[in-house]
């Protein structure tokens, strides 16, 4: 994916040195080299708090907690993005599989993959997303 850094489809500029300083090694490898964090190890796998999940690279709001569900796959799963404009999808033929890669539409950061085995009563989709690609902003509690 590092070859996509200067792709004009992604308006958010990325400086490699700045990203390496700002991101953890896992965040960098996941978002910039399409690595996958080990299952059941991500910070947000079991998070149930209300809020919004943002791209760790550029801050774009990607998923709402109301679209999150427990899939048992080991990564945070959502049945839809916050809107259709925040996600870029690309065919992925790596590792001997055919999958649909999911990227942030603003910066091109690798987020994970989308599969057609999500909740049938919703969209039927499962956005399987690396916690390392996300920052969570909790919804303020009402007093």
UniProtKB/Swiss-Prot annotation:
Catalytic activity: L-methionyl-[protein] + [thioredoxin]-disulfide + H2O = L-methionyl-(R)-S-oxide-[protein] + [thioredoxin]-dithiol
A single GO BP: protein repair
UniProt keyword terms in alphabetical order: Metal-binding, Oxidoreductase, Zinc
Required cofactor(s): Zn(2+)
Binding site for Zn(2+): 55, 58, 104, 107
Domain named MsrB: residues: 16-139
GO CC terms: cytoplasm
Active site: 128 (nucleophile)
TM segment ranges: none
Recorded superkingdom: Bacteria
One example GO MF annotation: peptide-methionine (R)-S-oxide reductase activity
Cofactor binding comment, as recorded: Binds 1 zinc ion per subunit. The zinc ion is important for the structural integrity of the protein.
Signal peptide: none
Alphabetical list of InterPro entries matching this protein: Met_Sox_Rdtase_MsrB, Met_Sox_Rdtase_MsrB_dom, Mss4-like_sf
Keyword Acyltransferase: no
Pfam families per UniProt: SelR
Family in the record: Belongs to the MsrB Met sulfoxide reductase family.
Name of protein: Peptide methionine sulfoxide reductase MsrB
Species of provenance: Burkholderia mallei (strain ATCC 23344)
Name of the coding gene: msrB
